[in-house]
């Protein structure tokens, strides 16, 4: 297998939780707990990509590999591409985007998404999904849904409830009749060569409608492998309520790094 580089994009200026990467989680900044999780994967290198020297300073005592990147990247994917270019990675090197607000991420999921991409040489990206078990989640536009083909490749990602159950939703919109619905998990593995091409493309029409970056790759004909997550994927930290929940789980020992 090619080398695997995990990149953790960490922006200081989160709109809902300013300074989110440095929020305290029982004596450690959130970004440190994410980094510790990533280091337990089989990756050959873990890099924190940040736009702020405060994050770099906070991670120095840990001996973390931190790269200061441009402050004006429109997305985490663009930040990944900068890291891949500066590291002069081989085109076949697998680069994993681990969100900087997921301090409970199981390292096994990082390894799973890497294997999925390594096993399909025709794919440029691999990601994960998990079953949706309730109507509220299915119809929530903040939850991204994905539809796959027979080979596990993505057919489409949407904020809408896809696929649409024409028969049952007309009579029982409060009931899921099958297990056809999948929630996308935002953990990605890319080939470094793909990242170099991606940042030169303009946003695609469907990407702009749905506000989903991965649709840009599909617009240009790139395949995305989607594996069913081998274990539960704990939600990240987007709100004060999420922060309280994660702190409680860590206190109870469920979030041990």
From Swiss-Prot:
Catalytic activity: 3-deoxy-alpha-D-manno-oct-2-ulosonate + CTP = CMP-3-deoxy-beta-D-manno-octulosonate + diphosphate
One GO molecular-function entry: 3-deoxy-manno-octulosonate cytidylyltransferase activity
Alphabetical UniProt keywords: Cytoplasm, Lipopolysaccharide biosynthesis, Nucleotidyltransferase, Transferase
Pfam entry (one): CTP_transf_3
SUPFAM superfamilies recorded: Nucleotide-diphospho-sugar transferases (SSF53448)
Pathway(s) where this gene product acts: Nucleotide-sugar biosynthesis; CMP-3-deoxy-D-manno-octulosonate biosynthesis; CMP-3-deoxy-D-manno-octulosonate from 3-deoxy-D-manno-octulosonate and CTP: step 1/1; Bacterial outer membrane biogenesis; lipopolysaccharide biosynthesis
Gene Ontology process terms (BP): CMP-keto-3-deoxy-D-manno-octulosonic acid biosynthetic process; lipopolysaccharide biosynthetic process
Enzyme Commission designation: 2.7.7.38
Superkingdom of the organism of origin: Bacteria
Protein's cellular compartments: Cytoplasm
GO cellular component: cytosol
The keyword Cell membrane appears for this protein: no
Function summary: Activates KDO (a required 8-carbon sugar) for incorporation into bacterial lipopolysaccharide in Gram-negative bacteria.
UniProt cross-references to NCBIfam families, sorted A to Z: kdsB, PRK05450.1-3, PRK05450.1-5, PRK13368.1
Protein family: Belongs to the KdsB family.
Name the record gives this protein: 3-deoxy-manno-octulosonate cytidylyltransferase
């Amino acid at each position: 297998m090619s080398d695997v580089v995990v990149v953790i994009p960490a922006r200081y200026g989160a709109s809902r939780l300013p300074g989110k990467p440095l929020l305290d989680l029982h004596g450690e900044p959130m970004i440190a707990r994410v980094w510790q999780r990533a280091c337990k994967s089989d990756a050959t290198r873990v890099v924190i990509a940040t736009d702020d020297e405060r994050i770099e300073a906070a991670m120095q005592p840990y001996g973390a590999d931190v790269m200061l990147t441009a402050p004006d990247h429109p997305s985490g994917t663009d930040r990944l591409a900068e890291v891949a270019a500066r590291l002069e990675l081989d085109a076949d090197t697998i680069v994993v985007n681990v969100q900087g607000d997921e301090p409970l991420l199981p390292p096994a999921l990082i390894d799973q998404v890497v294997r999925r991409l390594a096993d399909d040489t025709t794919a440029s990206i691999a990601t994960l999904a998990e079953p949706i078990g309730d109507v509220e989640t299915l119809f929530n536009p903040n939850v991204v849904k994905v539809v796959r083909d027979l080979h596990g490749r993505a057919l489409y990602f949407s904020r809408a409830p896809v696929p649409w159950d024409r028969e049952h939703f007309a009579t029982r919109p409060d009931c899921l009749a099958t297990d056809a619905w999948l929630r996308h998990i935002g953990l990605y593995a890319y080939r470094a060569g793909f990242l170099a091409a991606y940042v030169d493309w303009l946003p695609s029409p469907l990407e702009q409608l749905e506000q989903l970056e991965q649709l840009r790759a599909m617009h240009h004909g790139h395949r995305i492998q989607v594996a069913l997550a081998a274990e539960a994927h704990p939600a990240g930290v987007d709100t004060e309520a999420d922060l309280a929940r994660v702190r409680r789980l860590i206190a109870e020992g469920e979030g041990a790094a």
